[in-house]
Amino acid sequence: MPAVIDKPKKYGVKAPLPGVIVDVKVKPGDEIKRGDTVVILDAMKMENNITSDRAGKIAEICVAPGESVMEGKDLVILE
């Protein structure tokens, strides 16, 4: 019987509202804690710190500064 290999569970930090990415505060491989800012999002002429609601390691960055995003889009992926 072949060995079963568990794939790491991945979790996306999503945009809570539509806006434009101002800055990405993390890079792939960074270890973050719950509450750490991952992205700054400009929405309705206000800059919003988008934080992670769990700890993990950054697996992927899904956005870049200047990019417009819709509510619910993955900003970063944690593993």
How would you name each of these model-derived features?
Residues 5-79:
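Structured functional modules or segments
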